[in-house]
Regions:
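Alpha-helical transmembrane segments of multi-pass membrane proteins predominantly involved
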Residues: 1-309
């Protein structure tokens, strides 16, 4: 049974999310070093963090006619939305807020990132960031519907939008096993709303960094942190939605939640280094022709099962 946590969970949840994001960045750096033929070790793992002190003291870039307020609001929204999404993610038997509409809350925070990233592209009053922001909107329109149907599949199976109820409903069989399409689409959606790996089109090199192109200092650090915080949050949410939450033999519930989250996070980091960047127009075609019909059929499966009970 998942219970709403005490006040201290408000501190633990963001701290744990940050730790998972740091592990993901370190793991990605190690894979990058191996692919580049450099020495793999502690030095490779900490390399991305060496520039953090310099970024903290760097002067923000100022552009003519930029809307500094919208720019800063967009930059801050991305990591803040990622942290807020963790309020409904149970860790073991504890959750910060056991909302009856937890799935909706998580999805709403993810959609909030759309607005944040678009503002981060609009605010600088520069062509490349603006195009990057619009690229994310196009990408979002493609991945959001399949992602929503994947979330609906899990919620329909449990007949509840409460994340704890969805985890508890998998006591006999994980949803990842009998809803494999929903699970795979959800993982792709995590990479998409993190705009990492194959979905890094909004920050592509052909746009000189796109949304990230004009950011510097703390602003750039916040946007980059937001990407990895969302990856960690998405990996953690996969556990109660599709992998039975903290259920498992031998270990306490929190330990199983941690193990499963680390495995999903490791898989996502490995995938984002394996796949090339997908152009938004190609992903739109794939989503509307293939993914949306598949996820609709997948969502019908638990609905029919519940009707026949």
């Amino acid at each position: 049974v998942v219970e709403a946590g005490a006040w201290w969970t408000l501190l633990v949840a963001p701290g744990l999310l940050f730790a998972l994001a740091v592990l993901a960045v370190a793991g990605d750096a190690v894979l990058d070093a191996r692919n580049a033929g450099r020495q793999v070790g502690l030095a490779a793992a900490v390399r991305p963090f060496l520039g953090v002190p310099r970024a903290l003291v760097a002067q923000p870039r100022r552009l003519p006619a930029s809307d500094r307020l919208l720019w800063r609001a967009g930059v801050v929204t991305v990591p803040v939305a990622a942290v807020l999404s963790t309020l409904v993610i149970p860790f073991g038997n504890r959750v910060v807020a056991d909302l009856s509409v937890g799935v909706v809350w998580f999805n709403a925070m993810e959609v909030l990132t759309w607005g944040g990233l678009w503002l981060a592209g609009w605010g600088p009053n520069s062509a490349f960031p603006l195009v990057g922001g619009y690229r994310f909107l196009a990408q979002g329109l493609a991945y959001e519907l399949p992602l929503m149907f994947a979330l609906i599949s899990a919620a329909t199976g449990a007949e509840s939008l409460r994340v704890g109820d969805i985890a508890a409903a998998q006591h006999g069989l994980w949803y990842a096993v009998w809803m494999p399409v929903a699970f795979a689409v959800y993982l792709a959606g995590v990479l998409a709303f993190s705009f990492l790996g194959p979905f890094a089109y909004p920050v592509g090199r052909d746009l000189a960094g796109g949304v990230l192109g004009e950011t510097s200092g703390v602003d750039r650090l916040l946007l980059q942190a937001g990407r990895w915080l969302w990856l960690a949050s998405g990996a953690a949410m996969a556990v109660p939605l599709f992998l039975g939450g903290g259920a498992g033999p031998g270990l306490p519930a929190w330990a199983w939640s941690l193990v499963k989250t680390l495995l999903v996070l490791g898989l996502l980091v490995w995938v984002l280094r394996r796949l090339p960047v997908i152009r938004a127009d190609r992903y739109v075609e794939l989503a509307w022709v293939v993914l949306i019909p598949l996820t609709i059929v997948q969502a019908l499966v638990p609905a029919l099962v519940n009707l026949n009970r």
